[in-house]
């Protein structure tokens, strides 16, 4: 708070992501921070326990149901108003997380100490099953589906009149925890060619 307290973008402070353990300790930290510097909103944790001292809550789910959506038919007449109706603003946590097929063309980008071994395993499995010639089709089809799902979920949260907002899991793939091909950008933060920035900004 002393180091960044005057930064104009510092409006929310959360004690951590998906914390476990003694939430009485986290709640005490929130109360101390509120007393020390009341210029921002504080929360104990994302996606775990909503404590009485929270001034906002970031989660997949509230006591009234899921905010982050992973199922349902495409439509434009649904929102998360009922699920977001609690005592503080609710921010949907890590929306997205739709996996797509890997793009094997990305393998050649790995020129440093990190090797794309996971890509090689997936490519070998596809070849072993006689489907390697379909790899690009799988990538493009699942990628288009992922882009559509991002649009559906983002727009549903924008329609949620009492929503405090949403935060994506990430715009780029995350290679730090297994294989998470969840981004519209690859792990190098480069476009996968699935959607233009202008088109994506229509819903995000």
Q: Model-predicted segments: where are they?
A:
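Proline/serine/threonine-rich low-complexity linkers at boundaries of modular beta-sandwich domains
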Residues: 194-204
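Histidine-centered active-site microenvironments of extracellular/periplasmic hydrolases
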Residues: 190-192
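Substrate-binding/catalytic cleft of secreted carbohydrate-active enzymes
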Residues: 1-185
């Amino acid at each position: 708070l002393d180091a960044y307290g005057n930064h104009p973008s510092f409006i929310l402070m959360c004690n951590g992501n998906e914390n476990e353990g003694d939430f009485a300790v986290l709640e005490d930290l929130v109360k101390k921070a509120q007393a020390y510097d009341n210029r921002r909103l504080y929360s104990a944790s994302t996606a775990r326990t909503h404590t009485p001292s929270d001034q906002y809550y970031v989660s997949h789910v509230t006591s009234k149901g899921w905010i982050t959506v992973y199922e349902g038919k495409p439509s434009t007449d649904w929102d998360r108003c009922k699920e977001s109706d609690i005592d503080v603003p609710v921010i949907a946590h890590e929306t997205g997380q739709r996996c797509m097929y890997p793009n094997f063309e990305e393998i050649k980008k790995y020129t440093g100490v990190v090797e794309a071994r996971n890509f090689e395993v997936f490519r070998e499995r596809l070849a072993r099953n006689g489907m390697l010639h379909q790899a690009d089709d799988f990538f493009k089809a699942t990628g288009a589906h992922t882009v559509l799902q991002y649009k559906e979920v983002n727009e549903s949260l924008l329609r949620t009149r009492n929503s405090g907002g949403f935060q994506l899991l990430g715009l780029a793939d995350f290679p730090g925890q297994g294989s998470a091909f969840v981004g519209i950008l690859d792990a190098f933060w480069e476009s996968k060619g699935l959607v233009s920035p202008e088109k994506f900004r229509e819903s995000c």
